[in-house]
C-alpha cells in the first residue's frame, strides 16, 4: 500500500525522477529529484520522531541544467568506493560528477568530470542504470531510449 506521508511537499516538477543518497553525510538518506526542465532539486532528510521528512535545500542542485529530462543516478562507476553522480537527459547527454572526498568534511563536494561519456554514441532518451552485467567487477551501463529500446554499454575499463 503506497504511503506518501514522508514525501508530502517533495516535488521535482513534471516527470520527477528521484535518486537516493546521503548528500550531507549525516547517516540519513537524502533525495535528488530530476525533472522535465533538466534541473535537479536537492532535499535533505530530517527526522520528526521516527518518521522521515524532507526539506528542500536547493531548487537547482549544482546550478545544473542538462536540457530536458534530468535523470539522476548514483553509482560508483570508477571503483573508488565513493558514489558518483551521473545525470542523463532526454537529449542523449550524460554528465558525470565525482565527489572530492578530501575537500568534503560533512557533505559531498562534487566536481564535474568532463568528457567521461563523450566518446559514446548515446541515444536520445538518456535514462541510464548501472549494474555489473558481465560479472567482471565493474559497472556497465544500460540506457532506456525515447524509442523504447535499451542500449548496453560494457565497461572495459578504458
Label each PLM-derived region with a short phrase.
Residues 141-156:
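Blade-level signature of beta-propeller repeat domains, shared across WD40, Kelch, NHL, RCC1
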Residues 38-39, 92-93, 148-149:
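Loop/turn residues immediately N-terminal
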Residues 31-35, 85-89, 141-145:
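Hydrophobic beta-strand segments that make up the repeating blades of beta-propeller
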Residues 1-13, 44-67, 98-123, 156-158:
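Blade-edge motifs of beta-propeller repeat domains
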Residues 27-29, 81-83, 137-141:
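Glycine-aliphatic tripeptides that mark coil-to-beta-strand junctions in extracellular
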Amino acid at each position: 500500500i503506497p504511503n506518501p506521508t514522508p514525501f508530502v511537499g517533495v516535488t521535482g516538477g513534471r516527470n520527477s525522477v528521484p535518486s537516493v543518497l546521503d548528500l550531507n553525510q549525516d547517516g540519513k538518506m537524502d533525495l535528488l529529484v530530476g525533472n522535465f526542465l533538466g534541473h535537479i532539486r536537492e532535499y535533505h532528510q530530517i527526522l520528526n520522531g521516527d518518521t522521515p521528512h524532507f526539506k528542500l535545500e536547493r531548487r537547482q542542485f549544482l546550478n545544473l541544467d542538462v536540457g530536458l529530462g534530468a535523470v539522476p543516478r548514483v553509482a560508483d562507476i570508477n571503483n573508488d568506493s565513493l558514489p558518483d553522480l551521473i545525470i542523463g537527459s532526454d537529449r542523449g547527454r550524460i554528465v558525470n560528477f565525482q565527489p572530492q572526498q578530501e575537500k568534503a568534511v560533512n557533505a559531498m563536494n562534487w566536481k564535474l568530470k568532463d568528457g567521461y561519456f563523450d566518446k559514446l554514441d548515446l541515444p536520445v532518451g538518456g535514462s541510464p542504470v548501472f549494474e555489473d552485467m558481465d560479472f567482471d567487477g565493474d559497472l556497465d551501463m544500460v540506457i532506456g531510449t525515447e524509442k523504447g529500446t535499451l542500449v548496453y554499454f560494457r565497461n572495459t575499463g578504458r
